[in-house]
Amino acid sequence: MTDNKNIPELISGQESLRVFESLNRGMSRRNALQMLGVAGVAAAGAGSLFGVAGKVFADDAVAAGKGKPGGKIRVAGMSSSTADTLDPAKGALSTDYARHYMFYNGLTRFDKHLVPQLELAERIDNSDATVWTITLRKDVTFHNGKSLTAADVVFSLGRHKDPLTGSKVMPLMEQFVEVKASGPNEVQIRLSAPNAELPSILAVSHLLIVPEGTTDFSKGIGTGPFTVGEFKPGVRSVAVRNKNYWKPGLPYLDEIEFIAIADEPSRVNALLSGDVHMINEVNPRSTDRIGKSAKHRVVDAPSGNYTDLIIRQDQLPGKNPDFTQAMKLLLDREQVKSAVFRGFAVVGNDHPIAPGSRYFNSDLPQTVYDPEKAKFLLKKAGMESITMPVMASPAATGSVDIAVLLQQSAKQAGLKLDVNRLPSDGYWSNHWMKHPLSFGNINPRPNADVMFSQFFQSKAPWNESGWQNDQFDQLLMLARGETDDAKRAKMYGDMQTLVHDHCGIGIPVFISNIDGVDQRIKGYDSNPLGGFMGYMFAEQVWLDA
């Protein structure tokens, strides 16, 4: 992606809306680029310039029909538990996301440049980024034969505002003041304030569309490319080709068995032995093994994925800002990058916006490794010469190795860290966010608004460190409705500063997505949203056996 420092004039919210409307009326991609004065820019560049409000060049996407139909594949993800769910609203793990994209569709869908493409929405119109009208495709049916209508969309979006749903994106959906059917195949969304990012928000996996009135999600009734043949939470799922899928020629595969192998070496062994065709979350140390196999390949994509040190701010010792700052100073970022991730990473700065992202604050001073200053702060906090447990698990990519490095650094500062290596099974349910010191792993989000809303807003269910900051919450709301891009960039920059300076999150690096793939799998590409092609591989790949 392009660093915004290299673009003299980023497209504003109003310009984005203007282009979006023109594209909806049939403007060509070339003319759209000319409108912005950037004719000749590559498609990837165009995606970052248009931003998430820009329309997708849906007709320019990879066309169906190029793949070979038929075949069954077996895929091994990293995380699984009895909490696995086919309810998109409750998706929490990469395993959930991958399954959800097998069985459901959204109104929009991200391409590999994080530009939202029209999917169940045939057209999206608006005049002020506050009231949006969505026209639905008329040729879409659910797996049970029911036709897609506006009522299904109203139900699917509205359920996120009900606390009983347990939606993981409930704070994000608070801006949806009203969602109503304005026709059999037309939905009107009224927001509390202008938000040019709506097409991007609608592409979030939690907002995939389900039939009106659904209460039993175990059957995975959606409009997606596959139907549920079997689903056993914590064990496996079997996805069977949807013969009535509304996208001509898709999907290619007849069946996908999806399992989880928590242990990374075992996952790699399963790939190399031919037991599975695809794996995600490959440890950089394993890339040589996969690369030496003539039958397999490594798929590497830089991303906004990060493994973070969580310092709970609602309990001691994290309540003391000196302790929190000391822990961040003990993260040797360059060593984490080279020793833990073998260079498959870029250095982070204790906030979730990755370098190269559109609103990345390049003026923010970099936190550097400084055990002497950390020692001073620990003494000031009354935390010198004590023993402190830190929870790590293979479930949080690289966290065990990072914890060991942190343990060595802390020793120099007079703090003894006791690394508790917890198993992957049950880590997210039983330990994540529940200890004074632990680790998380956050998959990339499509834009700053979604990232900040889900993980840093005071009342977000995934507010990992329990950080409460009224100024941050106010800026989040203001930035969401700001259509002047320069002002919006300033707000996001200030939010990064607040997180960097005050939040109990230490982000040493941003990690590349590394997948291992059988050479017979074709159509497989990278996506910065996450492994498994941003979890959307199911309808895009085929088996050339």
What residue ranges belong to the model's regions?
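Gly/Pro-rich hinge or "lid" segments in bacterial periplasmic/extracellular proteins
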Residues: D111-V115, P194-N195, S200-E257, D263-P265, ...
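Ligand-site clamp/hinge motif
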Residues: N244-R289, Q407-Q408, K416
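Extracytoplasmic/peripheral linker and loop segments enriched in polar/acidic and small residues
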Residues: Q412, K416-Y427, S453-Q519, D544-A545
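Long beta-strand-rich cores associated with HINT superfamily self-processing modules
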Residues: V517-A545
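N-terminal lobe/hinge region of extracytoplasmic solute-binding protein
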Residues: A76-D128, G158, I221-G222
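N-terminal secretory signal peptides
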Residues: M1-N31, K55
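Structural transition elements
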Residues: F344-K380, A395-S399
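Surface-exposed binding/hinge segments that line
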Residues: D125, T135, V169-P211
